[in-house]
């Protein structure tokens, strides 16, 4: 794979939008590039977007490609994607949106509700944005996050798009799947730890620390949104494309996890 040298470009530090540190990213022309920081985030982004192309996902999602980045004498694995914002558009995270209209922190507000279904604040978002299918959108996001075990979904990477010219809101494509599938091998999920250890340690966000509790609450309110149409063979083929960039232990862990997830979420698997 071609190595892209970014020494001539200043990185934008991806801080404030993840709970796990400071990831290097670059905006060059109409593409974003992100360097792996915690482990195999690039592989995670690429694999999730590849597999979503074999699904009935009713909402748009960012498509990622693998990238190898050279910067300051170091080689990074990573990924790249097209900038999905058009002219006059800005991305508004729910945290910023909620603060703008209420003066309160959404993350703090969620902790005030004892019942998970009450924390899924769809009505408030729809009233502010005039988007009428936000509940279905949020449910699809939680289905993706539960299946791929995204530990980093929070009120700063659930977002809507605002057009400053028309002053209208629309749904954002799904993005930020880098910390799926135990990709953080530097801190929380070392590659020599068992799958059972990782499963016992991981916690969901933002409505519950349990993936299934928040998913069940959303699906009960808004119904099942996604059908996955890929096979385990598809997973192996997609992983093979990136096997030269990541250790065999990483590929084996992802295969093992996704085989388990296909069994656990069999109701989402569509032939």
Please provide the spans of the model-predicted regions.
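Active-site-proximal structural scaffolding
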Residues: 41, 45, 137, 151-154, ...
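Short coil/loop linkers at secondary-structure junctions
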Residues: 58-59, 132, 178, 268
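Generic structural hydrophobic/aromatic packing signal, biased to beta-strands
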Residues: 28, 33, 64, 81, ...
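Conserved kinase catalytic-core segment
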Residues: 117-181
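ATP-dependent phospho-/nucleotidyl transfer catalytic cores
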Residues: 83-142, 245, 249-253, 264-265, ...
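C-terminal catalytic region of ATP-dependent kinase domains
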Residues: 36-37, 166-271
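Short alpha-helical "patches" and their helix-cap loops
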Residues: 62-71, 154-164, 271
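Conserved ATP-binding subdomain of kinase catalytic cores across diverse folds
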Residues: 1-104
């Amino acid at each position: 794979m071609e190595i892209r040298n970014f020494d001539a470009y200043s990185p934008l530090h991806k801080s404030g939008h993840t709970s796990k540190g400071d990831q290097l990213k670059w905006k060059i022309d109409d593409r974003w590039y992100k360097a792996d920081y915690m482990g195999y985030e690039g592989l995670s982004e690429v694999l999730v977007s590849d597999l979503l192309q074999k699904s009935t996902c009713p909402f748009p999602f960012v498509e990622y490609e693998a990238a190898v980045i050279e910067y300051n004498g170091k080689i990074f694995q990573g990924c790249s994607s097209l900038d999905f914002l058009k002219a006059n558009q800005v991305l508004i995270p729910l945290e910023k949106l909620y603060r703008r209209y209420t003066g309160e922190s959404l993350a703090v507000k969620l902790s005030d509700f004892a019942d998970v279904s009450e924390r899924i604040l769809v009505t408030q978002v729809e009233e502010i944005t005039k988007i009428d299918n936000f509940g279905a959108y949020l449910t699809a996001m939680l289905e993706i996050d539960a299946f791929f075990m995204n530990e980093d979904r929070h009120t700063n990477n659930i977002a809507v798009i605002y057009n400053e010219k028309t002053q209208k809101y629309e749904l954002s494509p799904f993005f930020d799947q880098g910390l799926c599938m135990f990709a953080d091998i530097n801190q929380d999920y070392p590659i020599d730890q068992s799958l059972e250890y990782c499963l016992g340690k991981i916690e969901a966000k933002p409505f519950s620390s349990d993936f299934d509790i928040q998913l069940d609450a959303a699906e009960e309110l808004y119904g099942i949104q996604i059908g996955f149409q890929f096979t385990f063979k598809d997973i192996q083929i997609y992983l093979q494309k990136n096997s030269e960039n990541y250790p065999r232990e990483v590929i084996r862990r992802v295969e093992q996890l996704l085989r388990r997830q296909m069994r656990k979420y069999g109701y989402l698997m569509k032939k």
